[in-house]
A protein has these predicted regions:
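C-terminal cell-surface anchoring/sorting signal
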Residues: 1-8, 12-19, 218-237
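Surface-exposed, low-complexity/disordered Ser/Thr/Gly/Pro/Asn-rich loops and linkers
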Residues: 58-127
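A short glycine/threonine-centered beta-strand motif
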Residues: 126, 139-142
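Extended extracellular/luminal ectodomain segments enriched in beta-structured repeat modules
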Residues: 129-137
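Contiguous ligand/interfacial binding patches
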Residues: 23, 40, 141-211
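Boundary/junction segments of secreted and surface-exposed precursor proteins
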Residues: 17-43
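Short, flexible loop/turn segments at beta-strand junctions in immunoglobulin-like
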Residues: 127-130, 185
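Residue-level detector of conserved catalytic or cofactor/ligand-binding positions
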Residues: 215
Length: 237
């Protein structure tokens, strides 16, 4: 099933239970300059559900790749694989020291908005879900241009949502409904879920998800106020 998201009135994520660890995928961005700045190494990142042990996706040259077994926040195997493809990637200028700055430093882009790069959407496919299972997902976005629009679509879900503006300006902070979105109680129809991002220059910085073994035992966490040191992004000439 092809679905698009509805806007949530409140942004929250179900608390990860002991047997439902978080899984995080971070896109490092253009690897030519300062790759380390876009790598989450030993840091905690995620402004809605902070976690460690992020999986770093190197996408600096061909913007395509895969990870055979994503590591969970506990450092153990998740049994979930990831494969991604996009026409372009980019990164911020300056430095990144905290985990959240490192996550927002690099991103994979849809339709780069320049004659230098080909057009096309970003697709990320996660495989290894159990059909009918529930999970939560958080999407973190970034951009190198003011007002870029991004539309996210998830396939193989029994849920819906809508397009949204991924953020304004050269500031890599995460803002609810603008540069980060949390979706709760998603239902997998098959064993894989594909996230597609379209738009002009829209960038995907990271994805988190948390399988929920027992929905009745989940506890909602409110959003914490977590400040990020903003760093400027540089537009491609």
């Amino acid at each position: 099933m092809n679905t698009t998201f509805k806007t949530l009135a409140s942004i929250a994520i179900l608390s990860p239970m002991a047997n439902a660890a978080l899984v995080g995928l971070n896109f490092q961005g253009d690897g030519v300059i300062n790759l380390a700045a876009g790598t989450i190494a030993g840091s905690t990142a995620g402004t809605i559900a902070p976690q460690q042990n992020w999986n770093n996706a190197l996408n600096g040259n061909n913007n395509a790749g895969s990870i055979a077994d994503l590591v969970s926040s506990t450092g153990s195997s998740s049994g979930i694989t990831a494969a991604w493809l996009g026409p372009d990637s980019w990164r911020a200028s300056g430095t990144a020291t905290t985990g959240n700055e490192q996550m927002s430093y690099g991103f994979i882009k849809a339709n780069g908005g320049s004659t230098q790069v080909p057009s096309g959407n970003v697709t990320v496919t996660f495989s290894g879900f159990t059909s009918g299972s529930l999970f939560d997902m958080v999407i973190y976005t970034a951009t190198d241009n003011v007002g870029n629009l991004g539309t996210f679509t998830l396939t193989d879900l029994a849920n819906t949502n809508a397009s949204y503006n991924i953020g304004a300006g050269n500031v890599a902070t995460f803002t609810d409904n603008s540069t980060r979105r949390a979706f709760t109680g998603l239902t997998a129809v098959g064993n894989s879920v594909t996230l597609t991002m379209s738009g002009t220059g829209a960038g995907l910085a990271g994805v988190q998800f948390s399988p929920i073994p027992e929905p009745s035992s989940a506890v909602l966490l409110g959003l914490g106020a977590l400040g990020l040191l903003a760093h400027r992004t540089r537009r491609r000439a």
